[in-house]
Amino acid sequence: MAEDLTISKTGTKEEQYLSLIPQIEALLYGETDQIANLANVCAALKEQFNWFWVGFYLVKDQELVLGPFQGPVACTRIKKGKGVCGTSWAQEETIIVPDVDAFPGHIACASASKSEIVLPLYRGKNIIGVLDVDSEYLSHFNEIDSIYLTKIIKLLDA
C-alpha cells in the first residue's frame, strides 16, 4: 500500500488527474473495506486539488447519509431528489453546478461553497451513494472533472 502521495500542483487539471489515478489505484489495491477506501479517495482528492469539501454520502433507508469526507462539518442526511446530491441520486447522473446559489433547492451546508459536482457511486448496477465535491470558487468544475472523477469512483466498484 502506498503511504504517501506524490502531489504536483503544476500541469493542467487533466495532467494532475492522470498523475493521481495510479496512486489511488495503489491505495485501493488489496483493501476490501469500503469505508477505508472511500476515506482514502477523499484524502487523495483533497490533498491533490485542495477543494473546499470532498466526500461521500451513502444510501441508507431511502436517504443519503454522510460518509467519509475531508473538509468542514457537513449535512448528515439528504433526502432523495433534494439538493444537488439527492438530485444526482434520483436522476442517476453527474451534476455540475457552476453557481450553487442558482441551483433550485440547493442545500447550503456551508456558505463558503460556491460551485459543486456530484457523481453517483455504483456497486454493480445499483447506486450506493454519491461523491460530492465543493469549491469556494464559482464555475470551478467542468467536463474534465466529470470524466476523471468518474474513472476514480469506478475504481471503487472493481
PLM region descriptions:
Residues 53, 118, 130:
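Short hydrophobic/aromatic beta-strand element in the GNAT-like acyltransferase core
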Residues 122-135, 156:
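Sensory-domain boundary capping and coupling elements
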